[in-house]
Amino acid sequence: MIRAAVMADAPQLAALMTQLGYPTQAKEMRARLRSIFSDNSFRTFVATDDEQIVGMAGTSEHASYEHDDRTGRIVAMVVSDNAQRKGAGRQLMRAVEKSFRRRGVRRIVLNARLERVEAHQFYEALGYRKTGWRFAKLLE
């Protein structure tokens, strides 16, 4: 089942973010969710199985310099290791796309770390195409 995330999900979402490669404590996730939930451009979806969260997708939307359409961004997408290849990822992506369509978003972009080759294949199977590289720099 797919539903909107709530604050009580913070511990399970922290575990998923840690699995994704971003070590996160429940306290940190609660602070992040407070900020995210207060911003109407963000949506957070969770996939559940027997009341347990097995996946999450976090999205945002924004205007664009390069075209007139609003752009939807999948900011975070993860399915727990033991729930992969069981449909939760596809259900999350369908929910994300449906939510964007309802709000008039026509373009969706996402980033996937280079080492996540299986994720790249998953997105390509859903019709997403590689279009460039992402660069990052931590400002001190």
Predicted regions and their residues:
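Conserved acetyl-CoA pyrophosphate-binding loop and the N-cap/start of the following alpha-helix
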Residues: 83, 87-95
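Conserved GNAT acetyl-CoA-binding A-motif
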Residues: 93, 100-112
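Conserved G/P- and acidic residue-centered "switch" motifs that form tight phosphate/ATP-binding loops
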Residues: 9, 51, 87-89, 104
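Hydrophobic adenine-recognition pocket in adenosine-nucleotide-binding enzymes
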Residues: 5, 77-79, 112
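Conserved active-site alpha-helix within GNAT-family acetyltransferase domains
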Residues: 90, 106, 114-132, 137
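Conserved acetyl-CoA binding element of GNAT-fold acetyltransferases
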Residues: 69-81, 133
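Acetyl-CoA-dependent GNAT
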Residues: 7-11, 15-69, 75, 138-139
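Residue-level recognition of the GNAT/N-acetyltransferase active site
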Residues: 62, 80, 84, 113
